Amino acid sequence: MSKQLLLGDEAIAQAALDAGLSGVYAYPGTPSTEITEYIQMAPITTEQNIHNRWCANEKTAMEAALGMSFVGKRALVCMKHVGMNVAADCFVNSAITGVKGGLIVIAADDPSMHSSQNEQDSRFYGDFSLIPMYEPSNQQEAYDMVYNGFEFSEKTGEPILMRMVTRLAHSRSGVERKEQKPQNGISFSEDPRQFILLPGNARKRYKALLARQDEFIKASEESPYNKYTDGPNKKLGIIACGIGYNYLMENYPEGCEYPVLKIGQYPLPKKQLLQLVESCDEILVLEDGQPFVEKHLKGYLGIGIKVKGRLDGTLSQDGELNPDSVARAVGKENKSEFGIPSVVEMRPPALCEGCGHRDMYITLTEVLKEEYPSHKVFSDIGCYTLGANAPFNAINSCVDMGASITMAKGAADGGLHPSVAVIGDSTFTHSGMNGLLDCVNENANVVIVISDNETTAMTGGQDSAGTGRIESICIGLGVDPAHIRVVVPLKKNHEEMRQIIREEIEYNGVSVIIPRRECIQTLARKKRSK
């Protein structure tokens, strides 16, 4: 087959298409977004009617993908690492139900928090869910793992978790494609109770899952993605996970002097681990993220050998790996340091010139500072989070998707007035609606600003689930229509916005203000395409 130059994300997408994908389900989030976008733009997606719409959130995406698997078809679900927290309910239980059609879950982790609130490691989710996991070291492996992973999922009857990291997701390499497979036809499980997790059946299926762990370990021991390479210097043995193997080989282009165990499939392969441990004086673990393998190694085999890595300070406990940090860990002299030259000015992200969020924040901050000095503003995840920076300095919190509304409610419950939430339209339909329902049920004294730019802007302008329907959703959740106020955030409407904000702060109950103006970047793209 042909060879293509692909991002890591694109390699995953192309592999899924080549493997007979029937549907991709996702909520946009860096660094996973490009997977779904690639599938959406691929001609074969239209030709073969492959489902490819964005979902309201990661939980609905995971559930829809499991439904696709239920009818015997192959499904891909994609999210960033924090999205796993949202999808976890269905994800963990899907390990117990198992699958019919192949199901691969992509969790794109973000070590160093380039565009995230934390750098949690998704391997822990796969571990406590007791399912097999993949972690590619390069783009070709990412392709191969997904292409073959659907068959592996169907063979094991389990979803497969694949962990990506930012540097691999957003870098390019040549990828050899394989032959195109047809989509599966509709078929159903021979066990009519497979997906019914009543306690009696759930206990039975959970015991069966536990009994299969040795089978999964054996699959890891026989996997081409786990490779033991001997070396003459036995003072150190190296376990290199995922992209960590790439960084190690960059330091040893002619071959490493130490024995190396490359890890690309989990659970950990016991035989290869024992081989490495028994032949080396010390073990160094290279993993991009939290010390997942390092922690397992200390208790996994009951070994007394010294293990080095993030926990003992050989590698930093936070941030991502790079070739230089790996070089230092193995005692090699650094020829060059990664870093930003001092002559390059920092360019922190900022709200675009002409963005409706700017006019919203200017007006909101003006009213609050002038008339309500005790105010607090609880914000959310999206472009408008940049209101934390100068010149606005407008928000007091940003924790997780949907937290703005519920934190504002909690603060109001504690006596804060005014308590203001700022949330975007896409984040509102992702995880803000439940919080609004809580506010309505208790008639909380909060002002909720749903800043509607009619898209999911922060991740590149994907469709927003609530576009054109925010008012209807709020009415459906029980908000008094008289206190749902829509305004166009422009300078000419500045006084109108001020008056609306004042009126709704003075109202004792739930108020929703919707500043609505199309994202300036979306508007620019439309003009360029004409």
Task: Identify the residue ranges that each predicted region occupies.
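Thiamine diphosphate
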Residues: 1-139, 167, 257, 292, 386-512, 520-528, ...
